[in-house]
């Protein structure tokens, strides 16, 4: 009867089981139609996040460093700490040994300048591509096209624990929405790149992340999408994700009040000049007037702000420092790319690359 049908719950109406044994048995019995996985060559299982966290746990000291540095970054962004946030390190991590050597040197600089700077090491494992190319340590750790993602994820946690053991907080770019469950416990600052700043998936992701997140302006130079993302990520969202046991779940977030804008220039030129910063802050004020928070911004000295010429990054930083010395308001941090050897090289097997060069 209609009355009986109305009393059925969704769980009653759908063949859903919480039993892993039932799932296994149903999976063995399932016959998938020809409409499924047409373009999939292979499906390789990866251990759940909890397995990686259990095998490579953070020590109490590392966890305390992550929590403390996240709060330091929040205080800088909100003007409660007058130090400058500095996010610096390789374009992306491809050689854990070289990354460790670089981290040792940066840790010494951090200790020397910690009364003036909040230094965070750039530890990027995922590379967004305009078309195709090497997509980072997690995706292809051996740079040989074998895509050993299990090894890549293990190496990512190894690099992070090495960096934290030296007393350095870590920053990374969030690209794949599953990756955070594997490494976010070790991250103090996160970025959403220019190619993903309009993505609803990444706005939702940022709303649930436990650290401050910077949204970069679009590749065409527009800051509207990034400003909208900062606003949207400050509110609660509901979306599909996985938990630490690898089960698909519906995530409900509280919203991230610590999202902010990163100016990285564009194909049309730089946007770190005083007028661009003033206009960006004004646009943020308008777009976030009724939002959860209002922060200063971060200048990325690389990409469009240096014309993709790594030798100009230092010039950008020097100009920013001079303007801050003259009390320019609104700039709360800077980003720059740096490694043991200047310049960059094309991807190749590790033994064919220049050691310590991005």
Roles of regions detected by a PLM:
Residues 107-108:
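N-terminal intrinsically disordered, cationic/polar leader segments
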Residues 74-82, 286-294:
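Glycine-rich phosphate/diphosphate-binding loops that line cofactor/substrate pockets in enzymes
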Residues 18, 28-37, 116-283, 303-319, ...:
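Active-site-facing alpha/beta catalytic cores
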Residues 37-78:
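N- or domain-start disorder-to-order transition segments that initiate the globular core
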Residues 91-97:
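Short, glycine-rich nucleotide/cofactor-binding loops
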Residues 1-14:
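Short, small-residue-biased leader/transition segments that mark boundaries at the very start
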């Amino acid at each position: 009867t209609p009355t009986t049908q109305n009393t059925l719950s969704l769980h009653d109406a759908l063949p859903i089981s919480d039993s892993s044994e039932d799932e296994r048995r149903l999976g063995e019995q399932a016959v998938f139609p020809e409409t499924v996985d047409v373009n999939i060559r292979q499906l390789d299982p990866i251990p759940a996040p909890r397995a990686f966290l259990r095998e490579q746990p953070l020590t109490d000291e590392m966890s305390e460093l992550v929590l403390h540095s996240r709060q330091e970054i929040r205080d800088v962004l909100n003007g409660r700490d007058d130090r400058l946030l500095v996010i610096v390190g390789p374009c992306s991590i491809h050689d854990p040994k070289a990354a460790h050597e670089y981290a040792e040197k940066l840790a010494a600089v951090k200790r020397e300048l910690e009364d003036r700077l909040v230094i965070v090491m750039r530890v990027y494992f995922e590379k967004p591509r305009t078309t195709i190319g090497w997509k980072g340590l997690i995706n292809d750790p051996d740079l040989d096209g074998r895509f050993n993602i299990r090894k890549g994820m293990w190496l990512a946690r190894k690099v992070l624990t090495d960096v934290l053991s030296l007393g350095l907080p870590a920053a990374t770019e969030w690209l794949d929405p599953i990756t955070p469950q594997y490494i976010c416990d070790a991250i103090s600052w996160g970025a959403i790149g220019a190619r993903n700043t309009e993505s609803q998936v990444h706005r939702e992701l940022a709303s649930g992340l436990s650290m401050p997140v910077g949204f970069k302006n679009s590749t065409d130079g527009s800051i509207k999408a990034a400003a909208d993302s900062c606003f949207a990520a400050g509110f609660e969202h509901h979306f599909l994700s996985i938990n630490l046991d690898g089960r698909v779940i519906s995530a409900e977030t509280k919203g991230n009040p610590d999202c902010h804008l990163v100016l990285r220039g564009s194909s049309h030129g730089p946007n770190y000049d005083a007028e661009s910063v003033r206009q960006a802050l004004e646009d943020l004020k308008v777009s976030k007037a009724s939002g959860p928070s209002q922060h200063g911004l971060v200048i990325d000295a690389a990409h469009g702000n240096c014309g993709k010429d790594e030798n100009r990054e230092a010039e950008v930083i020097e100009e920013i420092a001079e303007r801050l010395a003259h009390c320019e308001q609104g700039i709360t941090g800077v980003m720059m790319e740096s490694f043991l050897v200047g310049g960059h090289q094309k991807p190749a097997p590790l033994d064919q690359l220049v050691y310590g060069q991005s």
